[in-house]
Amino acid sequence: METNQILETIRMIEEEKLDIRTITMGISLLDCMDGDGEVARKKIYQKIVTKARNLVAVGEAIESEFGIPIINKRISVTPIAIIAGSSADTDYVEFAKTLDAAAKEVGVNFIGGYSALVQKGYTKGDEILIRSIPQALAQTERVCSSVNVGSTRTGINMDAVRQMGEVIKETADLTADTQGLGCAKLVVFANAVEDNPFMAGAFHGVGEADCVINVGVSGPGVVKRAIEKVKGEPFDIVAETVKQTAFKITRMGQLVGQVASEKLGVPFGIVDLSLAPTPAIGDSVAHILEEMGLEMVGTHGTTAALALLNDAVKKGGVMACGHVGGLSGAFIPVSEDAGMIEAVQQGALNLEKLEAMTAICSVGLDMIAVPGDTTAETLAAMIADEAAIGVINNKTTAVRVIPASGTKVGDMVEFGGLLGTAPVMPVNGKSSVDFIARGGRIPAPIHSFKN
């Protein structure tokens, strides 16, 4: 390796905030199912603390050995609706508490997988789990929840969409003392993936190995600095620059994943190529788009800039790593991105523009605060719109929205840490009540029939 490449890597880490956002251990709980809920919970706790006992220590050892910051160590598990569904329990909050206790015991930041997959319909376990989400998130610290309400193959389960509007509303009310923090740990998906290392949407799919390591990289600051060097150049050059930068970022992710996998004796799964921002200055996806020539993110041209960024990151990342997966795109969470927050405050960025950007990026309406009096039906309709974009375009989309109790447009909602600060954004005041009340399923699109 040439000296200038070594110096470049050091600069990327020290000055441009390059880091590994997360090492996530996926753990299958299929062998923990039991007709007795208490027995199942004991098995779950035992398996998690056994498998993940050294996860944090290994992460810290890799940090000091390679000098690469690893921000989060996390766990994802098999959707609890599947595991708890075999028990006779009529409420699953105790399962959430078990996950929380296991996460605290091994020292991870978050544990994901308090989840249900209801894109086509409900099982008994799904019904109980979804009903228990508000209490589960109110009574735990580190548990994250997700529900998949649609897929390109099956269409959109509008009964689930309607219920999730109510669940989000109830979760916000139950966690009102922390400005609706519970909602920041709840994601509603269409086309959810089984190997996502990022929270709050991570769960360990049933098609996955017993235990696996997935890595999420992050480097918005590095990409912005690279684009600064090609100011005024045509888009071909910009795309090539982003591609080469993404290659370097992903190589580091692969290295960390492989080393962690060897040290833990667990198979290496995937690197997720998503560019994930933080509230820190110089770690913003919005600022990358602005560096391409936009006065402020949200103006005309924003969606095109995001398309170029997302595609170039994937092209560079795929070349750098044998197995990529997860969500693999750009994240645009409003509260976690200094540039997004500023654009909302200046009136340049609104919900409708964010929805358009969703057609390109990984998640969509992410970490968005809306007024506390937003109705459950309006929240459900927002979910339906996002799910439709995902289902029709055969991609993952999601909603993580916080109707913080007692807030109005222009207020600021403080979550702290990586979750940041969200300005409360206006929603369309016209009603979607009759639309959401219909229920049923929106059929799968015609182009989903590929067999």
From Swiss-Prot:
Source organism, top-level taxon: Bacteria
Pfam families: DUF711
InterPro entries noted in UniProt: UPF0210
Annotated family: Belongs to the UPF0210 family.
Assembly notes: Homodimer.
Protein name: UPF0210 protein Lm4b_00560
Species, as recorded: Listeria monocytogenes serotype 4b (strain CLIP80459)
